[in-house]
């Protein structure tokens, strides 16, 4: 890992932890809840279906599938490194969930939350789906020498996965931001 990448990874990790600390303040919690309620609002069955599908792109299984496609296509190094990044982001996210222990939105307010998927077992912060996808696309994108515009599009897709997590009722927006920062930290740390 280059020194610059190490410093960036530390900065993204620090920013992620700052988000967690901010949401423990009364004002941070209030703003997070307001943003969640707006994102979780009913927008009809088409939006439910789109976000229900988009969210799966952030699963570790989607990363495994993408890695398999890359490997079959002769891009084994990109596949292996991308999947390694996704796996490390997932493991880090699961570990942080146990440390932070934040309750999920649908448990905080069962009546006011639209829960559109099954209840996840782990706690809420950080959101692993955007972390996994952003770590994968950061590393695989660099391995594949994807241009800046393509990498921006892939990062935006990870952001959309994050939005889907709030829309579906399983994460506060700050969980998503924490997950995106974690995924970026892992991706940068593992990039050449």
Residue ranges of model-derived segments:
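N-terminal transmembrane-helix/juxtamembrane module of multi-pass inner/ER membrane proteins
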Residues: 1-62, 94-122
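Membrane-embedded catalytic cores of phosphoryl/pyrophosphoryl-handling enzymes
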Residues: 110-192
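Membrane-water interface at transmembrane helix exits
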Residues: 36, 71, 93-101, 141, ...
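Alpha-helical transmembrane segments of integral membrane proteins
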Residues: 4-12, 77-85, 149-153, 174-178
């Amino acid at each position: 890992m280059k020194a610059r990448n190490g410093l960036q990874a530390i900065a993204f990790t620090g920013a992620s932890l700052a988000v967690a600390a901010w949401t423990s303040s009364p004002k941070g919690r209030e703003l997070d809840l307001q943003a969640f309620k707006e994102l979780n609002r009913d927008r009809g069955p088409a939006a439910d279906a789109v976000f229900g599908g988009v969210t799966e792109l952030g699963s570790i299984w989607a990363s495994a599938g993408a890695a398999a496609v890359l490997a079959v296509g002769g891009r084994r190094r990109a596949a292996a490194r991308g999947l390694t990044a996704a796996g490390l982001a997932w493991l880090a996210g699961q570990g942080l969930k146990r440390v932070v222990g934040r309750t999920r939105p649908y448990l905080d307010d069962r009546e006011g939350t639209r829960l559109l998927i099954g209840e996840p077992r782990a706690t809420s912060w950080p959101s692993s789906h955007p972390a996994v996808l952003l770590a994968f696309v950061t590393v695989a994108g660099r391995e594949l020498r994807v241009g800046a515009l393509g990498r921006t599009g892939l990062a935006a897709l990870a952001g959309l996965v994050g939005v889907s997590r709030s829309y579906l009722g399983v994460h506060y927006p700050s969980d998503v931001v924490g997950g995106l920062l974690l995924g970026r930290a892992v991706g940068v740390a593992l990039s050449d």
